[in-house]
Each structure stands twice: as C-alpha cells, then as structure tokens.
Design a protein with these regions (language model features):
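Short, Gly/Pro- and small/polar-rich lid/capping loops
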Residues: 2-43
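Adenosine-phosphate binding glycine-rich loop
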Residues: 2-7, 206-207, 320, 324-472
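Conserved active-site and cofactor/substrate-binding residues in soluble primary-metabolism enzymes
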Residues: 7, 11-14, 80-83, 117-128, ...
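Glycine-rich, N-terminal phosphate-binding loop and its surrounding beta-alpha-beta segment
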Residues: 42-114
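Glycine/serine-rich phosphate-binding loop and adjoining beta1-alpha1 elements at the start
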Residues: 77, 97-223, 468
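Glycine-rich phosphate/diphosphate-binding loop of Rossmann-like nucleotide-binding domains
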Residues: 186-300
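Rossmann-like adenosine-cofactor binding region
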Residues: 258-349, 354
C-alpha cells in the first residue's frame, strides 16, 4: 500500500536521525543542525491580465546559517507547500556540506501553475515575490541566493536580479543575489547541464569502484550499462545525454504522458525533438510504448535514474524495481520505506543529497564569478595556449617529429569558462563520492550510502558550529 500522509520533511528528518547515531555530536547540537532556522510564509496580491486580483502563496525557508549566504532554488508548482520547501532547504544544507560548497541551505516556492499564466503575469508574480524577499532581508549576495528549480529558469532569474538591483541601487555585487541567470546577465557557461553532468560524474565514480561493482554483480565502468531515466526535463535530458555519450545504453525514458522502451538505445535529442513536434514522447520511431509511465521504473536495467519529482518509488513499488543502481537525480524520489526495501535487496541507492549537487556547485562558481566580476578563463586562456604552443614547438624541434593537426589543436587548447566549470564540477563530485564511500567502508554498521552521506554532512556542519562557537 502507498504510504498515506507522506511528509517529505519528516522523511528527511528520519534519514538524519538514522545517521546521527553514527556521529559523536551531542543531542542539542544535532537538534540545531536539523532545525529550520527561518520560515517565511507569504501571501501577496497580483492583478491578472483580465483585471481580477489573485492572491499568491509563496515561501522562502532558510534552513541553516552555519555558513552564509543560504542557497537554494525557487520552484513554481501547485504542489508547493511549507513541508516540501522545508525538506528541500534541509537537503540543501547537507548537500552543500557534502560537496564542500560554503553555503547554508535555503529553498523557495510559489504555489502557482506557471502554464496557467501569461508571461506578463509570471513576470509580475516573480518581481512581487522578489520584492517581498527584499523587504524581509531574505535575499542578497551575502544573505540568501536563490536559483532555478522546477518550473523556473533563466528568464525568472533575470527578472529577480533586475528587481533586486532596482530596489538596491549601487550595490556592486548585486548580480550575485541569484544564480542560474542568462550568461549575458552574469550567468556562467555550463550551468544548464550542471545537474545532469554531476549525476553522470557521481554514478561514473561509483561504477569505477571494483569492490562496489563486484557486490552488485556488475562490471566496472559505465560502458554498456542499461540505463532507464524517468523525466526528460533539464536534469533527465542531460543525464541521458552524458550516459549515452560515454557508452551506456539508455533503453527507456519516461515522462508524465507515458514511457517508451528501445532495446538498442534512445537518443535523447531526437526524442526531445519528437516530443516538441508531437507533444508527447510516445510513438517514438523504433520504440515501444509502455502501458503506464511508472512501468519504466520496474524495467530490468543496471542503472535507474529518477529525475522527476519526489516520492515516485515507495514501499508499494520498490519490490518490483529491478535496477542494481538507483541514482537519485531528483530530490527525494524514494521514501524511507523504499530505502528499507532496497537495503534488503542489496540495491545501491546513490542519494540525492549529493548526487544532484551539480546545480548548486556550478551556482557556487557563478556566484564567485559575480563577486570577482570577471569571466573564468579570461585572464589565462591565451597565455596557456601560447605557452602550450611554445612547448610543443620545442618538442617538435628536439625530436624531429611533427604532431597531427588534431593533436596540436587538443594540446594547445587553453581552458575557457565551460572547460573550467566542467572540470571543477568533476573534481567536486569525485571528491564527494570518495569521502562518502570512505565513511561507509570505515563503519560496517552504516547500512547504506544515504546514511553515510548524512554522516558526512552532519560531521561537517557540526564541526563548523563547534569551531565558530555558540553565540553569545
């Protein structure tokens, strides 16, 4: 039976409490780490295109200020509620700690269906929401820095930064009040694909660990692995893209209208264009339509990537999931009951709280760019290329051998912004994966990777509180 009265925040608290038993921190400090520090629930009027006034419900939660600013996305959805926003803000604290990004956790949401509003109405709602955050000091480059989430994107972030700058004239670092902006407005190249690429880097690192893969009965590496992706949004699309490009076989993709299966693999860009033309992923050439979109979750595969919304795998359907590895690209796609099932089955769950940290990691890079007021690579790209050219020319003169044009182009290339962003993200995800695995392997009592990830996060936040002291 599907769990009734599901609370996402309670689910996060359960995972926290489970991990806290494996740490040395006193009870009072653990309660502070777990608590949401500030919850701003708001309602404000907006005049719609037809002249009527609609009262909009919104939230911004700051889970922790052990490091500032707070960081977390803003989602537009009719499913937005205080419980969800609190849970997501909590996960942001733990996520940032795990990947060594110096932010506290935050999250925001507006309870609307963005598809039911015109562009002008969405702009007014976004700008009014931003002004409410400014009034209560809930936004700013050193206070709380939002980002895109479900139902929002670059457009909304541009509206936010413009509103903030209008209300805070002369603030030199104002571009850092929000991330996920268009590149022309201070955004960073590589942000769009960051979460999906981070998912790939994290799972690839796990797949490269021989001892882990041996326990699962799988060969090392991602090449040839059967992958199922739930969701063809930004995260699902890019997860599928990077797995396919690195030799995996994406056999199924699901969306809200249905799911498809193709034994020899699905090209995500071709499917995206098919959906754009027809309005659906169904009837994709060469693929089989599945009866229900949830059927994709239960297909035989090596890696399952839920990249949609939370609570899609629960105590009811978890026993039928056949994947050996589940990579939580979405926030909270598994309930605690599902976790218990997978622990008993020996399925490896790579947890959301670090696996989808690519977005906040690259948001951190964007924030740093905004504070430094210079594009990554601008100062060193040409210097590096000239130096590499000189070294290569010297080697050719000394050896009497010439490299091919393709090799020369590769060797002489100086890193530009997207190269540096991708490299920084790869380093971040590899380091985080290894830290979590080291904690898990060091204590055989820790039951799963999620608990090990929470232990990692709790220890880092606890250390911060201890070193800074409790004021006053």
């Amino acid at each position: 039976m599907v769990e009734a009265h599901y609370s996402f925040f309670h689910s996060v608290e359960q995972s926290f409490d489970k991990a806290a038993k494996f740490t040395k921190w006193e009870k009072g400090l653990l309660e502070q780490i777990k608590a949401c520090n500030s919850i701003y629930s708001m309602k404000f009027p907006v005049k719609m295109d037809d002249g009527r006034i609609e009262v909009i419900e919104g939230y911004r939660v700051q889970h922790s200020q052990h490091k500032t600013p707070c960081k977390g996305g803003i989602r537009f959805s009719m499913a937005v509620n205080q419980d969800e926003v609190m849970a997501l803000a909590s996960l942001m604290t733990y996520k940032c700690a795990i990947v060594n990004v110096p932010f506290g956790g935050g999250k925001g949401g507006i309870k609307i269906n963005p598809k039911a509003h015109s562009t002008y109405e969405l702009e007014k709602i976004t700008r009014r929401y931003t002004s409410e955050l400014v009034k209560k000091n809930f936004i700013g480059p050193g206070i709380d820095v939002p980002a895109p989430d479900y139902g929002t994107g670059e457009r909304e972030m541009a509206w936010i930064v413009d509103t903030y700058q209008s209300l805070k004239p002369g603030e030199i670092d104002s571009a850092g009040c929000v991330t996920g902006k268009p590149v022309s407005q201070g955004g960073v190249r590589g942000r769009k694909e960051a979460t999906g690429l981070g998912v790939f880097f994290g799972i690839r690192e796990v797949c490269n660990m021989p001892d882990v893969m041996a326990k699962l009965g799988l060969t090392t590496g991602v090449v040839g692995k059967k992958v199922v992706v739930q969701g063809l949004g930004n995260v699902g699309y890019h997860s599928a893209k990077f797995f396919r490009e690195h030799g995996a076989n994406v056999v199924s993709i699901a969306e809200f209208e249905g799911a498809i299966y193709k034994e020899d693999g699905i090209n995500e860009e071709e499917l995206f264009q098919h959906r754009k033309a027809t309005g659906s992923i169904l009837n994709f050439p060469g693929a089989t339509n599945l009866a229900k979109n949830t059927d994709a979750l239960e297909l035989a595969c090596d890696i399952l990537i839920p990249a949609a919304l939370e609570n899609v795998i629960n105590g009811d359907n978890a026993p039928r999931v056949q994947a050996k590895i589940i990579g939580e690209a979405a926030n909270g796609p598994l309930t605690p009951e599902a976790d218990e099932v997978f622990a008993q089955k020996g399925t490896l769950v790579v947890p959301d709280m670090y696996l989808n940290a690519g977005g906040v990691t690259v948001s951190y890079f964007e924030w740093l760019k905004n504070l430094s007021h210079v594009r990554y690579g601008r100062m060193e790209k040409r210097f590096t290329e000239n130096m590499n050219h000189h070294i290569l020319s010297q080697l050719e003169d000394l050896t009497g051998k010439k490299v091919s044009d393709a090799e020369r182009k590769f060797i002489e290339h100086g890193a530009d912004e997207v190269d540096l962003v991708h490299s920084g993200l790869e380093e971040t995800m590899i380091t985080a994966t290894r830290e979590i695995m080291d904690i898990w392997k060091a204590n055989p009592e820790i039951p799963d990777m999620r608990t090990a990830a929470y232990v990692c996060a709790i220890n880092k936040v606890g250390t911060s509180y201890t070193e800074l002291g409790i004021f006053p």
